[in-house]
Amino acid sequence: MLFDQIARNKRKTWLLLLVFFLLLGLVGYGVGYLWLGSGFGGLILALVIGFIYAVTMIFQSTNVVMAMNGAREVDEQTAPNLYHVVEDMAMVAQIPMPRVFIVDDPSMNAFATGSSPKNAAVAATTGLLAVMNREELEGVIGHEVSHIRNYDIRISTIAVALASAITMLAVMARNMMFWGGGRRRNDDDRNGSSGLEIILLIISLIAIILAPLAATLVQLAISRQREFLADASSVELTRNPQGMINALLKLDNSAPMQHHVDDASAALFINDPKKESGLQKFFYTHPPISERVERLKQM
């Protein structure tokens, strides 16, 4: 079961790469067509940027994501309780000891990152460490270690990298649109406009507007099931479903994180760091806590 899941996650990695690079190419084509005079040139440029960004994130994901979230690295002397729990869970999961980080934030949350178990890291907020008891902390850390063991982190890291690149290009395009930075067309261009050019213009605008949303939806599609799997895998490691249930119930009552969390990296956290309401709740990267608890009760 576990090895089948790891194999599926590896296949999903390549599928995600294909989908995200397709979205990236559409945005690049739109930017190139509208502002550079060459849709194909913009497409190539966007793919090159996205590839470099993705490779950088994959091989430096730990440092990049930790820096994005203001995390500081700790050791056995500076944070013994957290360090020992991470050490215990890693030992049970039979993975190398991850690096350990703390985020100075009063909310309760945690996340893991790294492209493979060999270069992974786990982070917890000061709020989580202040509220959770040992059994609950083991449940939370077991959840994050399970993400590492199941290679979920690689999928999330690629999603974070490419979604960020797509959003960056789309925002740049919208800013150029707002400030009137589009390519100038001469009289011959205007007189020679064809139906094809109009279609390309419409496609370019739609790509720029909708690609970030599409990237978010792809992240949603892969994020929710991996949360259920990590909850169950945590119980497999701790042999204590009630500890995980109690931890989730406390997380459900946590306030939003005070420091800014990048939209692309929000999916890495065990609990939604923004606690958004209204229409935004339909774009949660996490399944409802109540549903996660019910699934654990059925184990």
Swiss-Prot record:
Record-linked InterPro entries: HtpX_protease, Pept_M48_protease_HtpX, Peptidase_M48
Keywords: Cell membrane, Hydrolase, Membrane, Metal-binding, Metalloprotease, Protease, Transmembrane, Transmembrane helix, Zinc
Topology versus the membrane: Multi-pass membrane protein
Localisation: Cell membrane
Residues where Zn(2+) binds: 143, 147, 227
The enzyme's E.C. designation: 3.4.24.-
NCBIfam families tied to this protein: PRK04897.1 (NF003425)
Similarity comment: Belongs to the peptidase M48B family.
Protein name: Protease HtpX homolog
Organism for this UniProt entry: Streptococcus thermophilus (strain ATCC BAA-491 / LMD-9)
Lineage of the organism: Bacteria, Bacillati, Bacillota, Bacilli, Lactobacillales
